[in-house]
């Protein structure tokens, strides 16, 4: 399940950037916008479902850091929401660059939290998890 989660969020980030850049300020949406946005939503849903499943498994094992897991879950849900809001603002031709960079910053924070959690590579490297 962890591999599905990692694959889905990597593809979601790539699709988010592609979808965001497929909206021109002068010409509007490109013909590829709608399919990209739908595929992005699919991968965001896969990311949320697999992340929730990993959260449940970690809570059941008992040895996990529950506060960091909950914080990462909240950051992940916020990332999904900010992705949708920044794309919607861009689609309506509103100022969306600030929202885009806030989303990117929150993606990085969420990734750092994922790296230091018990299933992350830092914990596996030092034998903590």
Swiss-Prot record:
The keyword Metal-binding does not apply. InterPro entries: UPF0344 (IPR010899). One of its GO terms (cellular component) is plasma membrane. It is a multi-pass membrane protein. Its main location: membrane. It is found in: Cell membrane. Keywords: Cell membrane, Membrane, Transmembrane, Transmembrane helix. It comes from the Bacteria. The chain crosses the membrane at residues 1-21, 36-56, 67-87, 99-119. Pfam families: DUF1516. Belongs to the UPF0344 family. NCBIfam families: PRK13673.1-2 (NF010195), PRK13673.1-6 (NF010199). This is UPF0344 protein SAOUHSC_00907.
């Amino acid at each position: 399940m962890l591999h599905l989660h990692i694959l889905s969020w990597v593809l979601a980030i790539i699709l988010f950037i592609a979808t965001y850049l497929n909206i021109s300020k002068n010409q509007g949406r490109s013909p590829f916008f709608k399919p990209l946005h739908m595929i992005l939503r699919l991968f965001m849903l896969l990311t949320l479902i697999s992340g929730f499943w990993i959260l449940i498994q970690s809570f059941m094992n008992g040895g996990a850091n529950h506060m960091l897991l909950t914080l990462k879950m909240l950051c992940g849900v916020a990332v999904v929401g900010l992705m949708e809001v920044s794309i919607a603002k861009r689609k309506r031709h509103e100022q969306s660059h600030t929202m885009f960079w806030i989303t990117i910053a929150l993606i990085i924070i969420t990734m750092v939290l994922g790296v230091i959690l018990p299933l992350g590579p830092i914990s596996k490297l030092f034998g903590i998890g």
